[in-house]
Amino acid sequence: NAIVVGTGNKVEDFGIGFYTKYGDGGVDISPIADCTKTEVWEIGKELGILNKIIEAKPTDGLWDDSRNDEDQIGLNYSQLEEAMENPASKFFEKYSKIRKPNLHKMKPIPICKIKD
């Protein structure tokens, strides 16, 4: 009698698809999925989360080195959020190039409909 709670935010889940399909994307509920990364940090401050945790560079934890999300993506979260909100942003082209190959993660799973 339990559920898996997701940690994905709006930028990662619906902006650029920065998650592992059926990995950190395999959840029952996603309470912060409609929040940008900036909003998640603001919520953390409001909840009294330690600044060193809030200010730590985001990482997916998949690599045994010091690379972080921004190193892998090539844009920081502020730039990604700007591109998501404004197609005229100077970051929009790079954002779109990152997003396009990950769109399959954001679409519902296709199903085969069998007629009766």
Question: Where are the predicted features?
Answer:
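ATP/NTP-dependent adenylation/nucleotidyl-transfer catalytic domains that generate, transfer
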Residues: 2-116
